[in-house]
Curated annotation (Swiss-Prot):
PANTHER family: ATP SYNTHASE GAMMA CHAIN (PTHR11693), ATP SYNTHASE SUBUNIT GAMMA, MITOCHONDRIAL (PTHR11693:SF22)
GO molecular function, a single term: proton-transporting ATP synthase activity, rotational mechanism
HAMAP family reported in the protein's UniProt record: ATP_synth_gamma_bact
GO CC annotation terms, alphabetical: plasma membrane; proton-transporting ATP synthase complex
Organism: Dehalococcoides mccartyi (strain ATCC BAA-2266 / KCTC 15142 / 195) (Dehalococcoides ethenogenes (strain 195))
The name this protein goes by in its record: ATP synthase gamma chain
Keyword Flavoprotein: no
Keyword annotations from UniProtKB, A to Z: ATP synthesis, Cell membrane, CF(1), Hydrogen ion transport, Ion transport, Membrane, Transport
Disulfide pairings: none
Amino acid sequence: MANIRIIKRRIRSVRNIAKITRAMEMIAASKMKKAQERGLAGRPYSEKITEVIAALAALPQSGEILHPLLERRPVKKIAVLHITPDRGQCGGLVANINRKTGTFMLEQKIPVSAVVVGRKGVDFIRRIKQQMRAEFINLGDRPGYLDTLPISRVIMDDFMSGEIDQVFIAYTQFVTTAVQKPVLEQLLPVVPLELPPGQNLEYIYEPESATVLNSLLPRFVEMSVYHAILESIASEQSARMVAMRNATDNAKELIGELTLVYNKARQESITNELLDIVGGAAALA
């Protein structure tokens, strides 16, 4: 009888957990839809400004002074902008992006530091004992463009002052609801567009290309950081929704298994009671 009570208590406990994970799944689904819309809406602009900047950087600057964000110099120190969630419960997303950044940082033979977005990233960088230049947490589920400007400002200031010679950005790219891809790519200096031999650029710039480039470069860095954060948020909410759905399904499966065990134990208990009654009646006869 004690075993039946324990099993019944376990079924009730798992059922309560299933209710919680189901509620979390629904919340994540709602946030995911909004995050996906924002991330996908900004993707065409981000891709186009990247293309224009890379094309401009490939043009000869006619003796103009090179913009500091384009300056290539011997790499003596590297920085990584590491973008992660503030919270967990999103499957393997946090572990995957942390592994990507951690492997890269630990492989470097020169000093490397991190500018970290998200509490999970902050904890990870501290755990692997790497230098952290700055940390930004609690940006929320819907950060605005202005909210991310201090992040890009830290990166640009360090690069232009010569403290950092190369900047990489690590974030989780949203592919589909079920697929999120950890990405690590160079942000600074801007990589010029490599054109096939004989191919000409089709852009006509007014004013001249150098003026446009100098004006757009800071915006490009700011937009790249902002878009990477939006992609990471969309990936986080998608991964969390899938993780909570899997948790709910697993809870339902466990409830089914426990119910079967409970029914067998109850049937065995009833059979034993009947045998005791029959045995007692036979003894009295």
